[in-house]
Amino acid sequence: MIIDFRARPPYKSFLKLSLYKPWRPLPEDPAEWGAFELGREPNITADAHDMDAFVKEMDDNGIVKAVLMGRHADDFGIVDNDELYELTQKYPGRFFPFAGINPREEGAVEEVERCISKMGFKGISVDPGWLNPPLKGDDPIFTPVYDK
């Protein structure tokens, strides 16, 4: 069984992440390519922003399930936890959501509780290095979230 552990489907707030923004044309000289351009190929499903095509692409590649990571990372984007839940309802048994949590946000611990207990999320996703300013994963501000 193949499980994609960090899928980013073409759905609502995911579409606001840089992953879905149009790519600049590749420079002719490969020496000018950036890290995200090396080996890049067009992704028709991502460009179409079509969830059914995304699920078909999973099927075509033998991917049975996928983990969806929420994100609450200040300047780098938010993937809404309620939207992750919507996907679990639209495609039952297909996706395992992890709640995006920012420990600096008021109500972070309550959001962990809501997502795990009320919506059946399987874990949490934190992006300490993407926060503004960045944190280390063992910063004491995370303790109440980790304890939950």
Regions found by a protein language model. Name each.
Residues 1-148:
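Helix-coil boundary/capping segments in enzymes
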